[in-house]
Amino acid sequence: MTETKSITLPKAADSPGIGVPQDGTSSGAAGLSDASPLLVAAMTAGYEVVGSAPAGLPPGGAIGVASGISGPETEIVVGAIGNGEPAAAKPQKAKIRAKKTKPDAAGAKQAKHDLAEGKLAKHDVAEGKQAKPDMAVAKQAKHDMAGGKQAKPESLGAKEAQPETAGAKKAKTGTGGARETKPAGAKKLKAKSAKHAGAKLPAAKGGTPKDAASAARAAHPGKAGVKGARLKGGKLKIAKKGALKTAKGIALQPESPFDLSDSQWYLNRELTWLEFNRRVLHEAIDERTPLLERLKFVAIVSANIDEFIMKRIGGLKQQFGAGMHELTLDGRTPRQQVIECHTSIREIHARKREAFTEVRALLEQKGIVIESYATLIPKEKKFLREHYYANIYPLLTPQSIDPAHPFPFISNLSLNLLVTLRYPRAKEVSLARVKVPVGLGSPRFIRVGKGDHFIPLEDVMMNNLDMLFPGMHIVACEIFRVTRNANTEKDEEEADDLMAMIESELKERRFAPIVRLEIGSGMEPLHRGRLAAELELDEENDVFEVPGMLAMRDLFELARLDYPRMHDPAHHPIDHPQLLTTRNIFHTIRDARQILLQHPYVSFSTSIERFLREAANDPKVRGIKMTLYRTSSQSRIIEALLAAAQNGKQVAVVVELKARFDEATNIRLAEEMEEAGIHVTYGVVGLKTHCKVILVVRQDYSGLRRYVHIGTGNYHAETARIYSDVGLLTCDETIGQDATELFNYLTTGFMARRNYQALVPAPRLLKKALLARIEREMALHAAAGGGLIQFKMNALEDGDIVKALYRASMAGVRVDLYVRDTCRLRPGIPGLSENIRVVSIVGRFLEHARIYYFRNAGAEEYFISSADAMKRNLEARVEILCPVIAPELTRELRQIFDTYEADQRSAWDMRPDGSYVQRHPADGESGEGTHQMLIAQAERRLKESLKMKKKLPQR
């Protein structure tokens, strides 16, 4: 007897979702609502259409596909179909009969085989719910059959697809309707490189990759009629018992030849971050970089490695010290990671010394000299001795190291002299420690003689120790430096007072375990061993002997010297073309609806600071709310908030006290604001508040109106000049409502169900939204081709996102990733990631913006976010994903991606083994990097705007 099953999708819900205007018009929003790819995918899987398509079915529609259909004959009943058209009164039917033939070239297997093998995905096992991408919520078939319930259409703010549980088996996916995912003769790659935990992988192909967007548009010219899918709450109902196990909003796909749980497909987070520092160090070597900028990059790498040792190595040592041996996604234990990181750090240090030696010699030719004490003339030595006695000697505190005196406390990152001395007639020697007083107004480099000649402070001290130890014989003087663990966080759920707990952590951090000892070359082995023992370090692994200068991060002092020709060309951020006038900024935003800000190309002062300054003084402004993660110590942002409170406005600030290395500043600012009457809260217990949001409520002519700023970067005037970020000024009603919901959550911590219509917050929804959109792009690509995903972020570390991108590549979707530093994904592996490119931009500014793009069958979606694709951002922080819809703004974001693609100066292409190769301009090509091009684009937009204003009639 023939077994028959039906799937019914009733009329779609009317509630708009992310990126959907309130008037119901399509803007390329979020999901799947049309119908014909169901038939396409079923035929791909080996089914034959024997009836006519449902009445009203558009030729290029798309709906979720019921994967796992089995049985000799299946009926598919389609209700709401088309692009928002109402459903027919009586649903039409299309019959599909399974063929006894092999799958097509895509390698898609029949669902019956999938069921027999038990390899269908099981999402939300605990709750028995089907994944709910975007706005459409379809309960799992098995759950519906058991309970007889039907899911109500929900907006994006409702619950979305839960990430796969650890025990759930992953769905085997591949290329639907395309070529075989496993190339002919391809063999499973075996892990070989201990450094990168990877396989012996093919080298990256030469040449510059083609424009992905153009390639995607050209891929299927005959299918331009396929419109972007939208999730509008279609309800999935299983009308008959049978073997249908799951219903997913993706096309049927072949079984993957790659085991995505295999560690060889993933790179190590720590090692890829260190690889990023090799690219930064290359800027110090590159002769195209101005000389003092090269010195700056030496200092940057030194500071980066210091912070890495404090945060990452310190944390890893805590793990294996506590007996933790859990493997990472790439198959390493904490101890293995520390050992390999130390090896990489030693290599970077060696290369850094070579770079510094070269730059130092070139600077000498320009008259900037770092002297050694031995080369000074007597007159200069006399000057330095007098300077030492007057300005350094009073700050010194020598400490003896002997049985009568305990080993002294050594502060984090401090330079220290270990002095060996004895009395003139004594044979025994004694040891003393002297801290080099760098900081708090004391420079590391002292100017000597005429011109720009400098000598390190420690050199001056070493050669004038007789003043500090009169009557003693100085036997030797050696230098060392320590680095302490910065991971001292406590469980804030157990704290009665969060601020008091953070203050306690700061005190403990001063005395945290030491994780690295750096010593100058030539230190006595006995002294080296004694220091390691006193500091409780492994002498073999934790002690770094450094030839030459220690603490090269202090070279920032010299890199700031005023030599314009040895710096990058001066850059002065422009005023945004729409913010040039002195007109009330709220009137400007109201007329423009949305304004996109690109920092540092657009002035932070005349945009964001002005926004807050005018809000503080505008009599029509009723309230101001904002999040504060990092800001400068003398901040105009804080001044504006204090002024607003003094002017009687309601001001609420969510201060993140746990912003690493900014805790003390944030505590001081929080106390200052509380004293001024500002409502200060510290976010949600257990989560860091990392989103960047300002909400201003103003009494407009039509009632209260909400004005919002959402950004990817901190409200920090200094970093806004050197970090590349984007932000959005808007008075969009939906975004304003969502911002209000967000602040209600942040100021109370209540986990009540909140209905977000435009914004997508983490940790509840953001990761699910990204995964759902990746799956949707796969489904649309299977139906019509031309799939394209582009992400711009600082780091790609989350395992679920990486696996989803692998599946997208195997399905034929083009994936362009612009990732600044950490990237766990291996691009360019045939059959697995051959459709993925990873590019890192390293140049004048620090890339910091997060932009997410989905082609969505032509109804493109753009988002900006405070979140990277990292587990901590997506699951342990409060973040925001914000849609950018206005065509004039999406054109700007598209121009950013196109600029990255055109970069032949500061772009690095990632190879499958985790290494990178820098692009170089061919003959006749521009040698400008991304940042130079974006500066020129911003200035060009300003000039065009000024020309247009001159043409307008004067009022």
PLM feature spans:
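Polyanion-binding catalytic cores of nucleic-acid enzymes and NTP/SAM-utilizing transferases
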Residues: 801
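Long, intrinsically disordered low-complexity tandem-repeat regions enriched in serine/threonine/proline
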Residues: 91-96, 100-213, 218-238
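Hydrophobic alpha/beta core scaffold segments
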Residues: 814-818
